[in-house]
Amino acid sequence: AYNNLPILPPHAELETVQILKKTVSANKALAELHGWTYMQANPLLLLQTVSLQEAKSSSEIENVVTTNDDLYKAFSAPDSKIISPSTKEVLHYKDALWYGFNEIKQRPLGINIFIELFHKVKQRSDGIRSLPGTVLKNSYDETVYTPPDNKDDILRLLSNLENYINVNEGNIDPLIRLAVIHYQFECIHPFPDGNGRVGRIINVLYLIQEKLLDVPILYLSSYIIEHKSDYYKALQDVTEYADWTNWILYILDAVEVTAKKTLSMICLLYTSP
């Protein structure tokens, strides 16, 4: 187990020419999406639609699969007795996302919010694990990583992560920091279950906290599904070789591609008769 996971910030050059060039294009795509949603008087319906799709995609990464049809039926009749367990789990994710969005208006993103998101996603009342965590496996079912298994280490690492999220020493671009935060949370893997989903909610909440978005509209799950083996390879390369470059470029590309895709989808929704 990786009990000696290095604390943040990473001892590596995060602002290479290649990374900075990609940061510019990712920020531009994100700013265009931000500008468009900012101009909408009432984007709530749009946000509900997009967040339902994210809940579905993010859960799919964890092999919790439902159909759009089941999802929208359950969303419009949440008290129905015939909702499948998978669909319920997807709806819990959506609720957790909106809960987090409302919470970060009042307090900074940190350990307490992480635990509350876990409670919402998994509908259970325990918290940071005391037992060995689930290993991370790639698309071929090979173990790529075994997270820390000592609760004191987990709490120490989470406390360090919380500090990194809220104190930007060195004035590093928030999108580069997003990649670092996502890597670190995935590696700490603090909960008995639901870590991937909680981590992906943290991504969008961080962008909102950094004022790069006003509302939870950008989700990386569909990109991760499409490029899943690259995701695990880049993650593993940081752990094994301290190669941050490919991981950061992967996350920056995910932000850029997803921002453009989301904006196209919104424009289509708002301009179609």
PLM regions: where:
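FIC/Doc superfamily catalytic core
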Residues: 1-273
